Amino acid sequence: MRNLNLYDLIVCDIDDTLIYGFWTDLMSYSWNMFHSPRLSSVLMALQDWFNLYRVNEKLRYMINNSKTPIVFLTVRAESKHTFNILNKILAPERGFELMALGTDYGFIEKPEFVWQQLSDNPDILLIDDSDCIRANTEDLGVDVLDPRLLLEGFEV
């Protein structure tokens, strides 16, 4: 496991990174097809109310035991239910920021967000399930982590 305390800032994706399962796949497909903040909010509300997600337990453990500031970055529209889910998953004393980009261009805007943070935080770790986003961010000289390697039952 990587020591997250060695970094100045952690930038972490949510869907298919910290939480995963059928509903996160449905969220992804619905956002890509309809680009509807309202539909996204309804699906997030259902996940929040009925706990319709699985948590990447190893990643949760790493984040909860790190003192490094963390920003959760999502391409979806802003939703209070995203914040509620993160509060349920993380330890009560673990602070975080949530940044909802509401964009179709995550492969451009996520690395751009990291680039903007580099002036204040020279050592950043990006945790994201997207190969494209990790590759674009790694080109900036930022460390990246593929969270799929931390999932239970993952086989190489």
Language-model segments: which ranges?
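Acidic, PIN/NYN-like endoribonuclease modules and their adjacent C-terminal/linker elements
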Residues: 138-156
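Residues at the starts of beta-strands that form the adenosine-phosphate
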Residues: 69, 123, 143
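Conserved Lys-Pro-Asp/Glu-containing loop-to-beta segment of HAD-superfamily phosphomonoesterases
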Residues: 109-132, 137
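Short, aromatic/basic amphipathic alpha-helical patches
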Residues: 83-92, 117, 135-141
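Short, charged, surface-exposed secondary-structure boundary motifs
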Residues: 107-111, 153-156
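Short beta-strand/turn micro-motifs composed of small residues
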Residues: 74, 127-128, 148
